[in-house]
């Protein structure tokens, strides 16, 4: 259990309610952020403790979502903020309640449990090391050694390909050749490994785009790999996103079916920032500005990185209003959805 949160609650006891509602954690000290986290948790806990508070919270979020200034929305939803702060102080000293849910969490039921051999066990260890990203060259070399030991293991080749990709992404210029070669070996070992086909399509996209290739036959091969990946798992967001992006990289107009693929991908991983941003800007390009802005306003209230969300909202508003926006924010370069969902 995170016992240190009890200290955070005490340390944050003198944090004003205005700081919880309107403060920017990214501008706080480490101790300040920790205190903010604990007191903000308590605040949310209190706002979910009674039907009246729940209704106030709902009203506040709805008004902020409509673009009403946060302080005005807070006063209209909660009333006197001084009284709200006193209520929070009293709540801290009370016995906190919890609610036992009778409905289980939603999860995929098609779970397969497999006993791992020596190679599989080592692969899990190296996969986690790659995700940590502390020493990618050393992890890549260890994966190459494992691949030499088990040359016919498609999963090992796929993980080696991802390590090569991660290293290439951090290099200038980027050379995804070694990653693509490892993906070829993975596909040769197991032609039904959907993720290998999906990442192969992505590597091909990068290469063809860099080389300025517009040969329809080459881009058909890209989408052939995507189709194979999609057939293996129609609920995997990665092939859906790759299909959408293939038209962007080729420089072609995005067809309706690709817009639909991106929408489905987002519905599968709404928690992923990169996918959310991609989908929001695709909606904006279709002049669905209000929906696009609502999607990004979610990020503008992210306690860990609200500034990027605010810049993205400003960019979308500029697109809607037909005015230039020069401070174009960089999209996240990489996120966990590359491993579980998206390209």
Model-flagged regions — what are they?
Residues 149, 189, 232, 267-268, ...:
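Structural marker of alpha-solenoid helical repeat scaffolds
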Residues 145-146, 185-186, 228-229, 264-265, ...:
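Canonical positions in the second alpha-helix
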Residues 162-166, 199-210, 215, 219, ...:
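Alpha-helical adaptor scaffolds
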Residues 153, 193, 236, 272, ...:
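Residue-level recognition of tetratricopeptide repeat
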Residues 66-209, 309-343:
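Beta/coil-rich, acidic/histidine-enriched accessory regions frequently appended to metallopeptidases
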Residues 280-281:
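Alpha-helical protein-protein interaction scaffolds
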Residues 134-141, 169-182, 210-225, 251-264, ...:
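Structural signature of tandem alpha-helical TPR/SEL1-like repeats
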Residues 1-113:
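Acidic/His/Gly-enriched intrinsically disordered linker/tail segments
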